[in-house]
Regions:
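Binuclear metal-dependent hydrolase catalytic cores
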Residues: 2-232, 320-355
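Residue-level structural signal for beta-strand termini and adjacent loop
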Residues: 89, 237-238
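A polyampholytic, Gly/Pro-enriched intrinsically disordered region
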Residues: 356-362
Length: 362
């Protein structure tokens, strides 16, 4: 008994001494740890470590729903050492930073349509590219008709902030001409006369925009990126539509939005039970202009896509345990890999190869 008592007292004294010791040295220990973190993360640039090829980084796989694990819709495309962003959902600029992809490397932004959840994070992208990259000209922002109105609106909202930063840091650090964005609108052919148009062709990269069906939102487009024998399609928001299948023929990765109606109907019912009738109606409405995981899988199979990645996940999935319920019967329609997109995922397609490599950056 005495031995046991001594052991307990010794353990308590050791714990107390350790606590006192840690408390005494907490400040220098924390400073040292923070110094190491700063050294590791400042200037981090994963693009420099990637092989030549086409790469897809998911900087936002969420939707307008609150979701602690997913930012708003955003995909980063890296072609060789060039960086492009598709859609700029809220929080996605921070996610890009977590992934070690510097906003200063952005050459252009592409918007699929002008729903708020696809554009509400564009301000931080424009600001970070300008502030870190010291660009002399605004960020090009490509999109269908109306993109210049959207970009000009954000510029108007940020114009005071731009002025403050130039005044504080000097025009040398923040060149006034580089602030904001420049809308680069493109027109799709009239319906029935072709659904696609090449919007960028440069240094081996071809970006093709194609019409999708997100009615009543019009225009709405997806994008196909082709580089050195590799290809990625990003649909943007759409219900099942033939143009996605047509433009995804033989694509390496099809990034398709997905909504699971069975789970959305749970929300619809609960909103009604809580007498939140407006939200219950919204849950019913969103069912008619999105694509189910099963439909996305069927599209991927018909197109001969090598891999299907689902994004714009509706409703939010708090745990991976919920993924099978979200996917439903998708595997019955497509026998190749299906990935429920998560923020921080990186897919690498080495040039002139058939490999698809996966990595989680954070």
């Amino acid at each position: 008994m005495q031995r046991k008592t001594r052991w307990i007292l010794g353990t308590l004294l050791t714990a107390v001494a350790s606590t006192v010791l840690i408390s005494s040295f907490q400040r220098p220990i924390a400073t040292l740890l923070l110094e190491q973190m700063v050294h590791k993360n400042v200037g981090r640039n994963i693009i420099a470590d990637l092989s030549d090829g086409l790469h897809l980084a998911l900087c936002g796989t969420g939707s307008p729903f609150p979701d602690p694990t997913r930012a708003g819709p955003c995909s980063a495309i890296i072609a060789g050492d060039r960086l492009f962003i598709v859609d700029t959902g809220e929080g996605s600029a921070r996610t890009l930073g977590y992934m070690g992809i510097p906003a200063a490397k952005i050459e252009a932004i592409f918007l699929t349509h002008f729903h708020s959840d696809h554009i509400d994070g564009i301000g931080p992208f424009l600001l970070q590219r300008w502030g870190v990259g010291t660009f002399q000209t605004p960020t090009p922002v490509y999109g269908p008709t109306g993109v210049d109105q959207v970009v000009d609106g954000f510029r108007a909202a940020y114009v005071l902030d731009f002025g403050y930063r130039v005044a504080h840091h000097s025009p040398k650090i923040m060149p006034p001409g580089g602030s904001g964005g420049k809308g680069m609108p493109f027109a799709l052919p009239p319906t029935g006369q072709g659904d696609q148009v090449v919007v960028l062709e440069d240094k081996g990269l071809t970006v093709t925009a194609f019409r999708v069906d997100h009615a009543p939102i019009d225009p709405a487009v997806g994008y196909r990126f082709d580089y050195k024998g590799r290809s990625i399609v990003i649909t943007g928001d759409t219900k099942k539509t033939p143009s996605v299948q047509a433009l995804s023929k033989g694509v390496d990765i099809l990034v398709h939005e997905a909504l699971q109606p069975k789970l959305v109907k749970l929300l619809e019912t609960e909103f009604a039970n809580q007498h939140m009738n407006n939200m219950s109606q919204v849950m019913r409405d969103i069912l008619n202009y999105h694509t189910t995981p099963e439909e996305a899988a069927a599209q991927a199979a018909a197109a001969g896509a090598k891999e299907l990645v689902l994004n714009h996940i509706v409703p939010p999935l708090p745990l991976r345990f919920a993924y099978p319920a979200f996917l439903g019967d998708a595997s019955k329609f497509y026998d190749k890999p299906i990935t429920v997109g998560e923020d921080g995922m990186l897919f690498s397609l080495p040039a002139n190869s058939v490999l698809i490599e996966h990595k989680k950056l954070y």
